[in-house]
Regions:
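Non-catalytic terminal/accessory segments
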Residues: 1-204
Length: 204
């Protein structure tokens, strides 16, 4: 329920709670009942902002991130293609539910982070220096630059953010592998990028 002030909210909460408990003989969950600013509440995973727009609640984002982390754990021992195949339905389902929120900036950051996770996963699979160097050289990374990264003492996560790793496992390669793109599909779901009109053909 939405009211004009904190005082009014507390008064209405007490009145409604009394009605529910005394008249309807039901128990009000005090832990889930609160009086606060509209942008501090969450409903079905959404938060309503002061301007009336929807945003995604922090807990909903955290749960999504945990699912991604679980799928991209570096010790799973499965092929990267399987990792991508498991990510796709999770990402698609999450966006289909939350696409009505104003969240394009968030989605761009998530896309970047999610692509880096399988990039890191794949680098870890190259357990030897020579294996990593050859993996980087295969898609066209300069041999000397490949060796620099392969010999680097950086951890796999830091390596995955380096230019050589981005070139070897580019965004285009992930697109070709079928990795779901949150930002592009957000535009599609909200009709911000309409597909080009088909060429008219005469009907005979």
């Amino acid at each position: 329920m939405y009211v004009r002030s904190q005082t009014a909210g507390e008064r209405v909460t007490e009145s409604v709670s009394n009605f529910i408990e005394r008249k309807l003989k039901l128990l009000v969950n005090k832990d889930k009942s609160q009086v606060c600013e509209v942008n501090q509440t969450k409903f079905l995973g959404y938060t309503i902002q002061k301007d009336g727009n929807l945003s995604i609640a922090k807990k909903s984002i955290e749960r999504f991130n945990e699912k991604v982390r679980s799928i991209t754990k570096r010790n799973r021992g499965v092929k990267i293609e399987q990792v991508i195949a498991e990510l796709v339905p999770v990402m698609r389902g999450w966006l289909n539910y939350f696409h009505q929120a104003r969240c394009k900036g968030l989605l761009k950051n998530l896309d970047s982070w999610i692509r880096r996770k399988p990039r890191c996963y794949r680098l870890k699979q190259c357990k030897r220096v020579i294996t990593l160097q050859r993996f980087l050289e295969r898609p066209g990374v300069d041999g000397w630059q490949s060796r620099i990264l392969a010999l680097s003492g950086k951890g796999h996560w830091r390596k995955s953010g380096c230019p050589q790793a981005h070139q070897a496992l580019s965004n285009n390669r992930f697109d070709e592998a079928g990795l779901y793109n949150l930002t592009l599909n957000y535009d599609r779901l909200n009709n911000k990028k309409k597909p080009p009109c088909a060429r008219a053909c005469p009907v005979v």
